[in-house]
């Protein structure tokens, strides 16, 4: 099974558990760091995410994973909040943070810049528009390697 298929399968099974505990399943990733594998589950809530909330979700998801055993190799399960400088993975995330400052990291330079920071104005399937100072800058989505919320306290 491909990593993408694994993640999609896990999402379908984990999402109802997370929602049943009054959290949103923000993102799932399965990564190898050094010799270790990690299944990372990011949860969110309008009221924030507490350590106790992460523990509840971790226990519930761990039970499911023990039952269905979807991953053949050993791994560590981590459950956390996406954090203040969260990566915006989906259109749903972009929609939620319209009007907020974001950082766009690019695969290749546009006007000699590989990083743009500004207010998320709008987006569609092909591009993201941000306001930089008083100008609207349009960045093709295919050029974007990572979109991050600019955390502000």
From Swiss-Prot:
Quote the cellular component terms of the Gene Ontology held in the record. cytosol
InterPro entries on file: Ribosome_maturation_RimP (IPR003728), RimP_C (IPR028998), RimP_C_sf (IPR036847), RimP_N (IPR028989), RimP_N_sf (IPR035956)
Q: Where in the cell is it found?
A: Cytoplasm
This protein's UniProt keywords:
Cytoplasm, Ribosome biogenesis
Q: Name one GO biological process term.
A: ribosomal small subunit assembly
Q: What is this protein called?
A: Ribosome maturation factor RimP
Q: Which PANTHER family match?
A: RIBOSOME MATURATION FACTOR RIMP
- Gene3D superfamilies listed in its UniProt record: Ribosome maturation factor RimP, C-terminal domain (2.30.30.180), RimP-like superfamily, N-terminal (3.30.300.70)
């Amino acid at each position: 099974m491909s990593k993408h298929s694994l993640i999609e399968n896990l999402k379908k099974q984990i999402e109802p558990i997370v929602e049943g505990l009054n959290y949103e399943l923000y993102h799932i990733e399965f990564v190898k760091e050094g010799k270790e594998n990690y299944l990372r589950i990011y949860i969110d809530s309008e009221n924030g995410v507490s350590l106790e909330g992460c523990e509840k979700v971790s226990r519930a998801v761990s039970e499911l994973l023990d039952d269905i055993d979807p991953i053949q190799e050993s791994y560590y399960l981590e459950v956390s909040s996406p954090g203040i400088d969260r990566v915006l993975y989906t259109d749903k995330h972009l929609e939620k943070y319209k009007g907020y400052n974001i950082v766009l990291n690019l695969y290749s330079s546009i006007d000699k810049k590989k990083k743009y920071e500004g207010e998320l104005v709008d987006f569609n399937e092909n591009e993201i528009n941000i306001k930089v100072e008083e100008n609207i800058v349009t960045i093709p989505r295919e050029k974007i390697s990572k979109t991050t919320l600019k955390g502000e306290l």
